[in-house]
Design a protein with these regions (language model features):
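P-loop NTPase nucleotide-binding/switch module
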Residues: 98-123, 127-156, 172-216
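Residue "hotspots" at secondary-structure boundaries inside conserved domains
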Residues: 22, 58, 73, 125, ...
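N-terminal accessory targeting/assembly segments
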Residues: 1-105
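Conserved "cap/hinge" positions at secondary-structure junctions
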Residues: 21, 34, 69-70, 89, ...
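Compositionally biased, intrinsically disordered low-complexity regions
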Residues: 9, 16, 142, 161-162, ...
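Short alpha-helix capping/helix-loop boundary micro-motifs
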Residues: 15-19, 49-55, 117-128, 161-166
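Short, compositionally biased
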Residues: 43-49, 79-90, 148-169, 187-204
Length: 216
């Protein structure tokens, strides 16, 4: 998608709004009003778009600005996800409580996964520079808890020649742990986490079906 663009609110009906935003795309994430309320385009009508707001629209009025962010609504996948408690747009509730108490302020934007924590990364022993890797290849592991081993995989849609792989050590989520050159020559920097559009199904090699019910 293109970079961010600006528009304005035409109509408001609860969490559903009509906005004027030329060039909007279905599924695009938007920020609404001065509070930057989170929303998503759910339909297009010419240069207008219908959006759903994921926070209260109380106090908004026609004419207020809307920004299309140029990318779909996404989530972050990586170490820390399995230990976290999040709201519906993957905002970490524990961090929000520490900042704002029990009530979630509208328009509050916090990284879903902690950018200040270091994670113990163990690279896959079988991988060496020059190896051909593809989506789903295990780059290494992070021992997220005593019982949970988080496998760091090559994200979907990326594959090619492994240029280098980070040695064992503690890394921030934003640190580059591997570089991959795809067949077109583009170099991709892979981190301990990646973002994924919420409306796009995750690919899988096979699906294992349960044979026993979970008794609670």
């Amino acid at each position: 998608m293109s970079s961010s663009r600006s528009g304005y609110i035409r109509e408001i009906n609860g969490p559903i709004l009509r906005i004027h935003l030329p060039g909007g795309r279905n599924g695009e994430q938007v920020r609404i009003g001065s509070l930057d309320i989170v929303g998503e385009i759910i339909a297009l009508e010419g240069d207008d778009a219908i959006i759903q707001a994921y926070e209260s629209t109380e106090g908004l009025r026609p004419g207020e600005s809307v920004s299309g962010l140029g990318h779909p609504l996404t989530v972050e996948l990586g170490p820390g996800l399995l230990q976290g408690i999040f709201d519906g747009v993957q905002r970490p509730l524990a961090e929000i409580a520490g900042l704002a108490g029990d009530n979630i302020p509208r328009g509050l934007h916090i990284d879903s996964l902690d950018r200040t924590r270091e994670w113990p990364f163990e690279p896959a022993e079988a991988l060496q520079p020059g190896a051909e890797i593809r989506s789903g290849t295990r780059l290494g592991t992070v021992q997220e808890t005593e019982t949970i081993e988080h496998r760091i995989l090559v994200p979907p849609d990326i594959g090619g020649e492994l240029i280098d792989l980070a040695p064992a050590g503690d890394y921030l989520l934003d640190a580059t742990i591997a570089r991959v050159r795809d067949p077109q020559g583009t170099v991709h920097k892979l981190k301990l986490f990646h973002r994924w559009p919420v409306r796009r199904p995750r690919p899988y090699k096979q699906r294992d079906h349960g044979v026993e019910p979970l008794i609670t």
